[in-house]
Amino acid sequence: MKILIIGAGGVGTSAAMIISRAKKEGEWAEKIVISDYNFARAEEVAKMCGGGRFIAEKINAKDKDNMKEVIKKHEIEFVLNAVEPDFNENIFETCYETGVKYMDCAMTLSKRHPEKPYELAYIKLGDYQFERHEKWLASGNMAIVGSGVEPGMADVFAKFAQKHLFDTIDEINVRDGDNYQIPGYEGVAFGFSVWTTIEECLNPPVIWEKGKGWFCTESFSEPEIFNFPGGIGDVEVINVEHEEV
């Protein structure tokens, strides 16, 4: 398989490194093109992965024609979107138009209700992609969306629990907390895109309840202290906007 990773930040680098360490029997990943607007960063990651089948390319995720050129040049079969979700629609549509399989870790952006943003849900995260399900199905192509930790693993865990562990479930909450630090750095340590982190905290959180359906609340609503396992301990958590809902 010929793979294009768009974005050589933390997510793209991690994906490339995992591929480089995987067993090579059958060489399922025969070419991995690591691309970024910052070509020097893409080159750095390709070298970290050992070069060879890992190739660096400069790419502009805002430019569909540029992405199509890279896809055609390397005969790409699969695209991993590892950039912030502001670029999702462009990359998603480029893959549809070129017939290339697609995967992302976060979904297309939401839009607030124009009159009651903290009461009524409007365009939710991922709505743009879900609305195009039938179109992708008819084309014979495949898009795996929201395949990160949350969304992604959290949804799988919830479904597994519902199917195999419990007779009934009254409520599902997804809580995310950590205590990681960057050596030598005293500021706040962000685990992924700073812009995305700030936006999901400021946007109206979306909640679904049986009998009520989708609705929104105030940002930073329902604060609570939650004791996380694994030595993390007590962390204050709040409602945020997130795709797994």
Q: Over which residues does each language-model region extend?
A:
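Conserved Rossmann-fold cofactor-binding substructure of NAD(P)-dependent oxidoreductases
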Residues: 61-74, 87
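Rossmann-fold NAD(P)-binding glycine/threonine-rich loop
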Residues: 105-141
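Glycine-rich Rossmann-fold phosphate-binding loop(s) that bind the pyrophosphate
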Residues: 8-9
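C-terminal catalytic/substrate-binding lobe primarily of soluble NAD(P)-dependent oxidoreductases
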Residues: 163-245
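Helix N-cap at the beta1-alpha1 junction of Rossmann-like dinucleotide-binding domains, i.e.
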Residues: 37-41
